[in-house]
Amino acid sequence: MFRALFKVNASTRADATLLEYLRVDAGLTGTKEGCASGDCGACTCLVRSDENTPYQAVNACITPLGDVVGHEILTVDGLGEGGLHPVQSAMVSEHGSQCGFCTPGFVMALAARLDPNHPQGELTEVSDREAWNQAIAGNLCRCTGYRPILDAAQLAAKSAARARTLPQGLVIDAMHCSTEEGVKTESLAGFFRPRSLAEFRAARAAHPEA
């Protein structure tokens, strides 16, 4: 099980992205930075609010760190729990990785999509090719290796029980967080996530330029 509790410390900028935190602060370098603008999917990781909800694939390069405080984050570094996840094994078997830079993002997107509780419904090995195309629509392979990646997706779907079991991720906490007040960090830039309308109004009044 891949689970760790991290505190967002004073060295973490208030405007840091999830990707910056994962690679620099947490040392989890499996998640890659490709475009830094949310277009290529190389930085895809999975986020969920609690263990009773399905993971959602997000682009870590454009996700503010403050937005995922208290959420579980699963990266490619912990996907296999000591071995290869079925999606990773299938990518190897079907030669779905060429230069390899985009591979972690594709793996994470497919792992999330194989979840039977996914909001868009379950995909299986008999799902049509277009459904699988949509599953990786947010990921770009510059080597144009889409056919073997799609083959790997369908192969992974055959390992139903294993492919649909995702481990727990790391939980990101914050220094300034309580049940009564929203999350707030300060530096040259700031981040504030109010938990009530009153908090929002107070923050807006204090920073009308925001």
Where do the protein language model's features map onto the residues?
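Short, intrinsically disordered, charge-balanced linker/junction segments flanking boundaries
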Residues: 207-210
